[in-house]
């Protein structure tokens, strides 16, 4: 099998002449195929040291006709895609350099992405990173944060917000009728809208284990602040549980969930006397 010929000047005269004859014949054959298959105008003028007479293709008249059509175009159109060997090579080098830089950027982004997840998982110690890695990681994180912020803005523009997120699993809202008196700031709130067609619905979302988490969080805080747990504030959640609550003493409605709750009301005409009096 013949190997690929090296693209360089052939020093041997006889080999160079033989190569010229073969390549010239093959090139003229390609010209003929191009004109026949594609229906384009083409011509060639070959001048070589092996023949004192220039060789026009397909003929002298054919060359003059094609050149006359070519000269009818403006200078800008004629030179738009015209390049010499040096310009062609420079264009190829610039294109390959750009492609190489693009591949390097992609590889670097993959490395920084792996580095970011390694830091989040605790597999990489940030204090061991060098200056370039820290700078690239900073740029990468800012880029992702900007993407997240932009995504939030798009969701807000489309009418979607965090309030549309469904409640956590296992925390089912309790719905009660508005006719049941609700305690608010030590006083009673009654439905003042007599013409209301549908009852108002209140939703309670209980924060389970809220009180159970307070001692642990206080203990963790004391440990971080190096405070003696014996000297810390003693929190007793049962203090005052026997004291009477004015709004609940004569109320027949006692929720089974005795913990902090958030109240969500539908739009209605509900009047809070204590707020109106304060205003």
From Swiss-Prot:
Induction (record text): Repressed by MEA, FIS2 and FIE in seeds, and by PKL after germination.
SUPFAM superfamilies per UniProt: SRF-like
Subcellular localization, as worded in the UniProt entry: Nucleus
Domain of life: Eukaryota
Tissue specificity annotation: Male gametophyte, embryo and endosperm.
GO function term, MF aspect, one: protein dimerization activity
CDD domains assigned to the protein according to its UniProt record, in alphabetical order: MADS_SRF_like (cd00266)
Role, per record: Probable transcription factor involved in the development of gametophytes and seeds.
Protein name: MADS-box transcription factor PHERES 1
Name of the encoding gene: PHE1
């Amino acid at each position: 099998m013949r190997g690929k010929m090296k693209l360089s000047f052939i020093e041997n005269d006889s080999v160079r002449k033989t190569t010229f004859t073969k390549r010239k014949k093959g090139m003229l054959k390609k010209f003929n195929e191009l004109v026949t298959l594609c229906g384009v105008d083409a011509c060639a003028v070959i001048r070589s040291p092996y023949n004192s007479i220039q060789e026009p293709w397909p003929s002298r008249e054919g060359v003059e006709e094609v050149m006359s059509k070519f000269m009818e175009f403006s200078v800008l159109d004629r030179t738009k895609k015209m390049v010499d060997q040096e310009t062609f090579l420079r264009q190829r080098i610039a294109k390959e350099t750009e492609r190489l830089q693009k591949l390097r950027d992609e590889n670097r982004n993959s490395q920084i992405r792996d580095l970011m997840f390694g830091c989040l998982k605790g597999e990489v110690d940030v204090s061991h990173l060098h200056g370039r890695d820290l700078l690239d990681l900073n740029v990468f994180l800012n880029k992702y944060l900007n993407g997240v912020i932009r995504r939030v803005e798009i969701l807000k523009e489309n009418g979607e917000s965090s309030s549309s997120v469904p409640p956590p699993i296992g925390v089912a809202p309790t719905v009660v009728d508005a006719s049941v008196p609700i305690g608010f700031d030590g006083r009673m709130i009654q439905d003042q809208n007599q013409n209301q067609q549908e009852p108002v619905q209140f939703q309670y979302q209980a924060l389970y284990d809220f009180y159970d988490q307070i001692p642990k969080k206080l203990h963790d805080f004391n440990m971080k602040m190096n405070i003696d747990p014996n000297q810390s504030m003693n929190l007793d959640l049962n203090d005052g549980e026997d004291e009477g609550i004015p709004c609940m003493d004569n109320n027949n409605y006692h929720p089974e969930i005795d913990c902090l709750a958030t109240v969500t009301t539908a739009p209605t005409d509900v009047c809070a006397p204590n707020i109106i009096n304060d205003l």
